[in-house]
Protein backbone atom coordinates (compact mmCIF):
# COMPACT_ATOMS: atom_id res chain seq x y z
CA UNK A 1 0.00 0.00 0.00
CA UNK A 2 2.83 2.39 0.93
CA UNK A 3 4.64 1.67 -2.31
CA UNK A 4 1.48 2.24 -4.27
CA UNK A 5 0.95 5.74 -2.68
CA UNK A 6 4.48 6.81 -3.57
CA UNK A 7 3.17 7.78 -7.02
CA UNK A 8 6.61 7.91 -8.54
CA UNK A 9 8.08 10.59 -6.12
CA UNK A 10 11.58 10.04 -4.85
CA UNK A 11 10.48 9.01 -1.41
CA UNK A 12 7.11 7.82 -0.31
CA UNK A 13 5.00 9.93 2.01
CA UNK A 14 4.41 8.12 5.27
CA UNK A 15 0.79 7.08 5.45
CA UNK A 16 -0.87 5.32 8.25
CA UNK A 17 -1.92 1.82 7.16
CA UNK A 18 -4.99 0.36 8.72
CA UNK A 19 -5.04 -3.19 9.78
CA UNK A 20 -6.27 -5.52 7.15
CA UNK A 21 -9.50 -6.12 8.91
CA UNK A 22 -10.35 -2.45 9.45
CA UNK A 23 -9.63 -0.96 6.08
CA UNK A 24 -13.16 -0.68 5.01
CA UNK A 25 -14.84 0.30 8.26
CA UNK A 26 -16.57 3.73 8.37
CA UNK A 27 -15.42 4.33 11.92
CA UNK A 28 -11.80 4.04 10.90
CA UNK A 29 -12.27 6.45 8.05
CA UNK A 30 -14.00 8.93 10.36
CA UNK A 31 -11.16 8.71 12.89
CA UNK A 32 -8.62 9.30 10.18
CA UNK A 33 -10.53 12.34 8.93
CA UNK A 34 -10.82 13.76 12.45
CA UNK A 35 -7.14 13.22 13.02
CA UNK A 36 -6.34 14.98 9.75
CA UNK A 37 -8.54 17.95 10.70
CA UNK A 38 -6.80 18.17 14.07
CA UNK A 39 -3.42 18.21 12.35
CA UNK A 40 -4.64 20.89 9.94
CA UNK A 41 -5.97 23.00 12.80
CA UNK A 42 -2.69 22.65 14.69
CA UNK A 43 -0.75 23.61 11.58
CA UNK A 44 -2.94 26.70 11.09
CA UNK A 45 -2.42 27.67 14.73
CA UNK A 46 1.33 27.28 14.40
CA UNK A 47 1.35 29.34 11.20
CA UNK A 48 -0.91 32.06 12.59
CA UNK A 49 1.11 32.51 15.79
CA UNK A 50 4.05 34.31 14.10
CA UNK A 51 1.60 36.46 12.17
CA UNK A 52 -0.26 37.45 15.34
CA UNK A 53 3.01 38.03 17.13
CA UNK A 54 4.20 40.28 14.31
CA UNK A 55 0.97 42.25 14.31
CA UNK A 56 1.17 42.65 18.08
CA UNK A 57 4.74 43.87 17.78
CA UNK A 58 3.80 46.39 15.10
CA UNK A 59 0.86 47.61 17.18
CA UNK A 60 3.00 48.04 20.27
CA UNK A 61 5.69 49.80 18.27
CA UNK A 62 3.08 52.16 16.85
CA UNK A 63 1.76 52.93 20.32
CA UNK A 64 5.28 53.63 21.55
CA UNK A 65 6.00 55.98 18.68
CA UNK A 66 2.99 58.20 19.34
CA UNK A 67 4.30 59.70 22.60
CA UNK A 68 7.68 60.21 20.96
CA UNK A 69 6.09 62.13 18.12
CA UNK A 70 4.08 64.18 20.61
CA UNK A 71 7.21 65.02 22.54
CA UNK A 72 9.00 65.93 19.34
CA UNK A 73 6.15 68.13 18.15
CA UNK A 74 5.90 69.75 21.58
CA UNK A 75 9.63 70.46 21.59
CA UNK A 76 9.47 71.96 18.10
CA UNK A 77 6.46 74.10 19.08
CA UNK A 78 8.16 75.34 22.23
CA UNK A 79 11.33 76.08 20.31
CA UNK A 80 9.39 78.12 17.77
CA UNK A 81 7.43 79.94 20.46
CA UNK A 82 10.55 80.97 22.34
CA UNK A 83 12.11 84.14 20.89
CA UNK A 84 15.61 83.84 19.55
CA UNK A 85 18.37 85.86 21.22
CA UNK A 86 18.32 88.31 18.31
CA UNK A 87 14.61 89.03 18.89
CA UNK A 88 14.80 89.67 22.64
CA UNK A 89 14.29 93.38 23.38
CA UNK A 90 17.11 95.00 25.27
CA UNK A 91 16.61 98.54 26.49
CA UNK A 92 19.04 101.13 25.17
CA UNK A 93 22.08 101.84 27.28
CA UNK A 94 21.56 104.80 29.56
CA UNK A 95 23.54 107.84 28.44
CA UNK A 96 25.22 110.23 30.87
CA UNK A 97 23.09 113.25 31.67
CA UNK A 98 22.58 115.80 34.40
CA UNK A 99 20.31 118.70 35.26
CA UNK A 100 21.35 121.03 38.08
CA UNK A 101 19.30 123.74 39.76
CA UNK A 102 20.50 126.85 41.52
CA UNK A 103 21.00 127.01 45.27
CA UNK A 104 21.55 130.00 47.50
CA UNK A 105 25.02 131.37 46.94
CA UNK A 106 27.49 132.34 49.61
CA UNK A 107 28.12 136.11 49.38
CA UNK A 108 31.58 136.93 48.11
CA UNK A 109 33.34 140.19 47.35
CA UNK A 110 32.81 141.20 43.76
CA UNK A 111 36.01 141.88 41.89
CA UNK A 112 36.00 143.75 38.60
CA UNK A 113 36.53 141.60 35.50
CA UNK A 114 36.44 138.43 37.57
CA UNK A 115 33.79 135.78 37.00
CA UNK A 116 32.62 133.66 39.91
CA UNK A 117 31.57 130.00 39.61
CA UNK A 118 28.05 129.11 40.77
CA UNK A 119 27.09 126.43 43.29
CA UNK A 120 24.39 123.99 42.18
CA UNK A 121 21.90 121.51 43.62
CA UNK A 122 22.40 118.05 42.08
CA UNK A 123 20.09 115.61 43.90
CA UNK A 124 17.04 117.48 45.23
CA UNK A 125 13.85 118.60 43.49
CA UNK A 126 14.25 118.56 39.73
CA UNK A 127 18.02 118.17 39.94
CA UNK A 128 19.71 114.87 39.08
CA UNK A 129 22.89 113.25 37.78
CA UNK A 130 22.62 109.89 35.98
CA UNK A 131 24.65 107.17 34.27
CA UNK A 132 28.09 108.21 35.42
CA UNK A 133 27.71 111.98 35.34
CA UNK A 134 28.95 113.51 38.61
CA UNK A 135 28.83 116.91 40.26
CA UNK A 136 32.04 117.73 42.13
CA UNK A 137 33.20 121.11 43.45
CA UNK A 138 30.92 123.34 41.34
CA UNK A 139 31.61 121.28 38.20
CA UNK A 140 29.95 118.60 36.10
CA UNK A 141 32.47 115.83 35.42
CA UNK A 142 32.16 114.12 32.02
CA UNK A 143 32.29 110.30 32.42
CA UNK A 144 32.95 109.32 28.78
CA UNK A 145 34.06 110.95 25.56
CA UNK A 146 31.47 112.00 22.99
CA UNK A 147 29.28 114.79 21.70
CA UNK A 148 27.31 116.54 24.45
CA UNK A 149 24.64 119.18 24.43
CA UNK A 150 25.39 121.74 27.14
CA UNK A 151 22.84 124.30 28.30
CA UNK A 152 22.28 126.86 31.04
CA UNK A 153 19.81 129.56 31.92
CA UNK A 154 20.70 132.20 34.48
CA UNK A 155 18.07 134.64 35.72
CA UNK A 156 19.26 137.93 37.22
CA UNK A 157 17.22 140.39 39.23
CA UNK A 158 17.89 144.00 40.20
CA UNK A 159 16.35 147.22 41.50
CA UNK A 160 15.94 150.75 40.18
CA UNK A 161 18.33 152.16 42.75
CA UNK A 162 21.16 150.15 41.31
CA UNK A 163 20.32 151.20 37.79
CA UNK A 164 19.97 154.79 38.90
CA UNK A 165 23.38 154.75 40.54
CA UNK A 166 24.93 153.22 37.46
CA UNK A 167 23.21 155.66 35.10
CA UNK A 168 24.54 158.60 37.10
CA UNK A 169 28.05 157.28 36.85
CA UNK A 170 28.27 155.97 40.42
CA UNK A 171 29.32 152.36 40.50
CA UNK A 172 28.96 151.01 44.06
CA UNK A 173 30.62 147.68 43.19
CA UNK A 174 27.76 146.94 40.79
CA UNK A 175 28.33 146.03 37.13
CA UNK A 176 26.60 147.85 34.27
CA UNK A 177 25.99 144.51 32.52
CA UNK A 178 25.45 140.86 33.37
CA UNK A 179 27.57 138.11 31.89
CA UNK A 180 27.30 134.32 31.85
CA UNK A 181 30.08 132.00 30.71
CA UNK A 182 30.06 128.20 30.44
CA UNK A 183 33.63 127.08 30.99
CA UNK A 184 35.44 123.82 30.30
CA UNK A 185 38.36 122.75 32.43
CA UNK A 186 40.52 119.94 31.04
CA UNK A 187 43.74 118.36 32.21
CA UNK A 188 45.12 118.67 28.68
CA UNK A 189 44.78 122.48 28.68
CA UNK A 190 46.66 124.78 31.04
CA UNK A 191 43.79 127.29 31.27
CA UNK A 192 39.97 127.02 31.33
CA UNK A 193 38.32 127.34 27.92
CA UNK A 194 35.22 129.44 27.35
CA UNK A 195 32.58 127.40 25.50
CA UNK A 196 29.60 129.80 25.57
CA UNK A 197 29.25 133.44 26.59
CA UNK A 198 26.20 135.69 26.99
CA UNK A 199 25.95 139.32 28.12
CA UNK A 200 23.15 141.79 28.74
CA UNK A 201 22.89 145.42 29.81
CA UNK A 202 21.49 145.74 33.33
CA UNK A 203 19.91 149.18 33.10
CA UNK A 204 17.84 148.84 29.95
CA UNK A 205 14.80 148.35 32.22
CA UNK A 206 13.96 151.28 34.47
CA UNK A 207 11.88 149.41 37.08
CA UNK A 208 12.61 146.39 39.27
CA UNK A 209 13.81 143.90 36.72
CA UNK A 210 14.37 140.24 35.97
CA UNK A 211 16.52 139.25 33.05
CA UNK A 212 17.33 135.71 31.85
CA UNK A 213 20.25 134.62 29.72
CA UNK A 214 20.08 131.23 28.00
CA UNK A 215 23.04 129.45 26.43
CA UNK A 216 23.09 126.09 24.69
CA UNK A 217 25.15 124.27 22.07
CA UNK A 218 26.79 120.95 21.21
CA UNK A 219 30.42 120.24 21.99
CA UNK A 220 32.80 117.32 21.66
CA UNK A 221 34.10 116.51 25.14
CA UNK A 222 36.65 114.10 26.55
CA UNK A 223 36.38 111.86 29.57
CA UNK A 224 37.36 113.80 32.68
CA UNK A 225 36.48 117.26 31.31
CA UNK A 226 34.80 119.52 33.87
CA UNK A 227 32.06 122.03 33.09
CA UNK A 228 31.09 125.03 35.21
CA UNK A 229 29.05 128.21 34.93
CA UNK A 230 30.57 131.57 35.80
CA UNK A 231 28.74 134.87 36.23
CA UNK A 232 29.84 138.46 36.52
CA UNK A 233 27.98 139.08 39.83
CA UNK A 234 26.69 136.32 42.10
CA UNK A 235 24.59 138.76 44.15
CA UNK A 236 22.31 139.43 41.16
CA UNK A 237 21.53 135.75 40.47
CA UNK A 238 17.92 134.75 41.20
CA UNK A 239 17.95 131.55 43.27
CA UNK A 240 14.30 131.69 44.43
CA UNK A 241 12.98 129.09 41.94
CA UNK A 242 14.69 126.10 40.37
CA UNK A 243 13.01 126.66 36.99
CA UNK A 244 14.59 130.10 36.64
CA UNK A 245 18.26 129.24 36.96
CA UNK A 246 19.62 125.86 35.91
CA UNK A 247 22.51 124.09 34.19
CA UNK A 248 22.86 120.72 32.48
CA UNK A 249 24.44 118.47 29.88
CA UNK A 250 23.68 115.15 28.20
CA UNK A 251 25.40 112.79 25.79
CA UNK A 252 23.89 112.76 22.29
UniProtKB/Swiss-Prot annotation:
The record marks 188, 191 as: Important for binding TNFRSF6B. GO terms for molecular function: cytokine activity; tumor necrosis factor receptor binding. It is a single-pass type II membrane protein. GO terms for biological process: immune response; positive regulation of canonical NF-kappaB signal transduction. Keywords: Cytokine, Disulfide bond, Glycoprotein, Membrane, Signal-anchor, Transmembrane, Transmembrane helix. One of its GO terms (cellular component) is extracellular space. It comes from the Eukaryota. Residues 61-252 are extracellular. The keyword RNA-binding does not apply. This is Tumor necrosis factor ligand superfamily member 15.
Amino acid sequence: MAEELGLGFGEGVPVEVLPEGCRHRPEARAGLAARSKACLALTCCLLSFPILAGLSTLLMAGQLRVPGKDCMLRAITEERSEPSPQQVYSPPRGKPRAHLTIKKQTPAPHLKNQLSALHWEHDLGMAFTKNGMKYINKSLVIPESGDYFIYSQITFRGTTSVCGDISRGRRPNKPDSITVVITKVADSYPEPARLLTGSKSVCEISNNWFQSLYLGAMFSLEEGDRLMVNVSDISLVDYTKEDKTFFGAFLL
